[in-house]
């Protein structure tokens, strides 16, 4: 694997309503530790040169003391406030890296803090993929038949399942590529409302094709109470990696 500087931006600024909890999903306890801690630990143990933790503006001090200091995450160099939307939080993280002098040819991995079961193998594949292709995302083939609905809720078409992939995080990029792509969508007058992930920014704003690398069916995003139950079972069984 190419020897480059590696950084992770871990996003923990969301307050998912679907969890139906007063506690933000990233702070819910999973096997006795916050969901966010599991995600951060995976990157801490994967040799990141720096980790930027992006959290809610009113949670920055809490995360510094109760997450970063309490759990000894020495690779977390900054805790920065996020924004209203996911892309705002990513941009804040990228700007923090830029201000810290992160090299343009370095690799940055962007990860949802609510994906606690990411592991070192997925992270390594993402880094390797970004080194080779400049842009890659962890992904898995979809298992279910997917249908496209019309405006009235009737089935309109059925895409070929063999072409459909479930996109996960981390999503990894050469720093210059992802920074410049985000810079364009934050230009005055740019429409960001339809942006759903980082790969989409690269697809829209550059000519670089985004490569899929193997993720894991266990690399779930904790969004609903049922997800917490599934994550507990997977963590208990040690099944953090279910591949192709």
PLM features per residue range, with description:
Residues 46-47, 69-75, 101:
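Short helix-capping segments at alpha-helix termini
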Residues 84-149, 168:
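Conserved beta-loop-beta/alpha segment of the NTase-like Rossmann-fold superfamily
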Residues 148-173:
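Short, flexible, basic/aromatic active-site loop/helix in glycosyltransferases
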Residues 49, 106, 208:
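Short acidic/polar active-site loop segments enriched in Thr and Asp
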Residues 10, 36, 93, 112, ...:
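Residue-level signal for inorganic ion chemistry
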Residues 2, 165-244:
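Conserved alpha/beta core of the MobA/IspD/sugar-nucleotide pyrophosphorylase nucleotidyltransferase superfamily
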Residues 2-63:
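N-terminal glycine-rich phosphate-binding loop and ensuing alpha1 helix
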Residues 72-84:
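Conserved donor nucleotide-binding strand/loop of the catalytic core
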